[in-house]
């Protein structure tokens, strides 16, 4: 693991430990995903496995969310060959901080977001300040829209990483929708993000991309008489237009397994 990512993720874990202790609610999961992905720079395909630690919690001022991915594949090409990637978002709730009320409104809360994205081998660091709107929609456990900056603080070519980039913006929609069919419990969850185009330090065009990662999963634990939502099995579909800012488009089904502890 490279130094910038190690520092960022170490800070994330320390913060999550502190906030979890004082959390109003907390959820931590281990995910395993497996599918056939494409290297957008060489166009070669490889079977890739992604191990993820994901955490979400709420406390008196708002909520926190982060995940850490470890990716490995069966192609030795310098891409996703044992690499780490992580994201962290802290949201400060105006409803909680300013005692704002959204009675009888589809809008549930407004939050100020501070986030970062960090990649290991590429030595990428992005800061994402912005605004998050949480919505009250019947049937959904959560539904949010987030608009942030996408501010580059990467090491760049001189630091042995991917080229530095100009700044841009991100729009993200995330949701969770639980439902039941014939006594079996399911959840449709995921997110869709759009990040606007930018330039890199070589003068190249980094295209705006659309990334959708919907997940349909079955509560296997419930079927086995375990606690609800503890063991989930399903399919995650990744659709990525202009993957990592290239001309590559990707549509990949993945086996998805999630364990909550």
What is each residue range found by the language model?
Residues 1-26:
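Cleavable N-terminal export/targeting peptides
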Residues 22-71:
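Short glycine/proline- and aromatic-enriched beta-strand/turn motifs that initiate or cap beta-hairpins
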